[in-house]
Amino acid sequence: VTGSPMAEVLHQNLAEIEASDVHNRLGLEKGKYILLSAHREENIDTEKNFLSLFSAINAMAEKYDMPILYSCHPRSRNRLASSSFQLDSRVQVQQPLGFHDYNCLQMNAFAVVSDSGTLPEESSFFTSVGHPFPAVCIRTSPERPESLDKAGFILSGIDEKGLLQSVDTAVELVKSGDYGTPVPNYIDENVSTKVVKIIQSYVGVVNKMVWRKEI
């Protein structure tokens, strides 16, 4: 009914996102790092999936030979600490990054590799404001197929072959100027206004017809 509030939130914070000094603080060069977020229960807590995904991440580090900045959630950090799995030295494990810093890193990354549910929305928004980035979703099924249908991101799966092919494809498409098409509801910036007007418009009707209240 209302669309996603993500674009409105990002738009309201865009100046702060663009002004972030996170690259200087972390010693990163724009366009020469991969931003990673991997925290989904199915990717972290299931042994087979965990080993498949993180082996693929190590292969990605070896292939591209650039820093992989891992914004690491507590679930993932604890899983890595309890495992004997060794991450490639190019994977830099960081505490979870703040909103402004993370989004600044997204829009300046060589590629964003993430299992976050908001990746399709962020990709659509940043494309719409002139900051497209190669977006790769490390999951086996999408939560937001409407963005996949608009070529807003690539669903890679969690195996090495799928991940490497997907990063290659996403990067080359963005380089060629083919960014996909933003999903209209993902770039709608008046969601809060719609919510207020819908509530004000329908509260009387709902109270009368659903809850049988006398107004």
Model features per residue range: what roles?
Residues V1-I215:
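Nucleotide-activated sugar donor-binding and catalytic core shared by glycosyltransferases
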